[in-house]
Amino acid sequence: MGVTIVLGSQWGDEGKGKITDMLSQQATLCCRAAGGHNAGHTIVHGSNTYDFHILPSGLISPSCVNLIGAGTVVHVPSFFKELAALEEKGLQGASKRVFIADRAHVCLDLHSVVDGLEEARLGGRKVGTTGKGIGPCYSDKAARRGIRVGEILDEALFERKLRNLESGYRARFGDLEYNVEDEITRFKEYRKILGPHIVDQLAFLQKYKDSPNTLVEGANALMLDLDHGTYPFVTSSSTGLGGAVQALSLNPTSISSIIGVVKAYTTRVGSGPFPSEQLNEFGDKLQSVGREFGVTTGRRRRCGWFDLVLCRYSQAINHYTALNLTKLDVLDDFDEIKVGVAYILPDGTRTENTIPADAEVLDKVQVEYITLPGWKSNTMGVKKYEDLPANARAYIEYIERGLGGVPVKWIGTGPARDDMICRE
């Protein structure tokens, strides 16, 4: 099995869907390793725009089988709603090519209610979650009281565990705007149609052990990783290389490439430190030109300059073999473009390669920038590297050098499926 892993290198929304879509055309199997319907990928394919949340993007390729892995949390209503939306847009037979590991956990409507209550209790210290129930679901998993997807098929077991969860949350929060009987009733219907999608992950993957091309699609990004991200302003799963290996039982020696996806600038949704954020006309312009609104929440994304410190840190943890730089065209009309190259910590320490673990310290760092000239010309839809303006090529090559020579093999130059330069 030759495995390619695609990972977000910043705070998510880097545009992982397009490279995943492109690579899935040659893949036999596409797997999601972690996260849930809090993730969001947009793929423009012909005249259709597809929004993916819990489903793997490999569904667009008619020859690619797709697995939602053991490290994920699955909101069953969203799973079926998303499948129906894809089939309505012409992806006929998609439902026959997607499977769920029986060890994945069930994200309930109950978890979404609890998510809102937990955020409300934090007041001004909100994490800024998507409100989808991801955190409470992973909390139940860690506390060993969660419900696994395979347990949905055992009606008595499922109902007993769900009632126990509801009872525990009522003891904690008091009255809940939630009716456990309604959720139980909905799952009576899901149970009838979910069975064919549920698989023993290890046995399933064994069938593909000789596959020359397996694609692993990362969700969220390294800076949202539970261990390595800007804790506590993170998601509740392991979003990096280690999480993918663990969740899908990958043999590390089978990994042929690790692709880090980086936006040509930096964005973040929700709360938390963001050293290179631009709360000025530059940030507003990036937001407007880049149409920076979250696929999952619709929230306005915070915008800032490219941060080499953050990306060096990400590279050190995820060990990228190549990069996909996205949305280069958004920078077309800037006279000058800044790149963050170092942080000055509150105590005066200068760092180029790592970030402080303390979110409050990270929030107070000063960023040291270099300024590069813009190219002030259109790169939208450019297909060849040599056709890019000289200053655009200089920008890309500066990033490559700043990340120790990791090659930028793919460059996104627009929203369409084929708006991609391949430097193979």
UniProtKB/Swiss-Prot annotation:
Pathway listed? Purine metabolism; AMP biosynthesis via de novo pathway; AMP from IMP: step 1/2
Q: Which residues bind Mg(2+)?
A: 13, 40
Cellular component, GO annotation:
cytoplasm
Question: According to its UniProt record, which cofactors does this protein need?
Answer: Mg(2+)
An annotated GO BP: cellular response to cadmium ion
Tell me which EC number(s) this protein carries: 6.3.4.4
**Uppermost EC category:** ligase
Q: Where in the cell is it found?
A: Cytoplasm
Q: Which residues bind substrate?
A: 295-301
CDD domains cross-referenced by the UniProt entry: AdSS (cd03108)
Q: Could you tell me which InterPro entries the record lists for this protein?
A: Adenylosuccin_syn_GTP-bd (IPR018220), Adenylosuccin_syn_Lys_AS (IPR033128), Adenylosuccinate_synth_dom1 (IPR042109), Adenylosuccinate_synth_dom2 (IPR042110), Adenylosuccinate_synth_dom3 (IPR042111), Adenylosuccinate_synthetase (IPR001114), P-loop_NTPase (IPR027417)
Annotated positions binding GTP: 12-18, 40-42, 301, 327-329, 412-414
Going by the entry's taxonomy, the superkingdom of the source organism is recorded as Eukaryota
Q: Which UniProt keywords apply?
A: Cytoplasm, GTP-binding, Ligase, Magnesium, Metal-binding, Nucleotide-binding, Purine biosynthesis
From the UniProt record, which GO molecular function terms apply?
Answer: adenylosuccinate synthase activity; AMP binding; GMP binding; GTP binding; magnesium ion binding
Could you say which residues bind IMP here? 13-16, 38-41, 130, 144, 220, 235, 299
Instruction: Give the multimer and partner information.
Output: Homodimer.
Which family does the similarity line name?
Belongs to the adenylosuccinate synthetase family.
What is the annotated role of this protein in its UniProt record?
Answer: Plays an important role in the de novo pathway and in the salvage pathway of purine nucleotide biosynthesis. Catalyzes the first committed step in the biosynthesis of AMP from IMP.
Which protein are we looking at? Adenylosuccinate synthetase
Organism per entry = Aspergillus terreus (strain NIH 2624 / FGSC A1156)
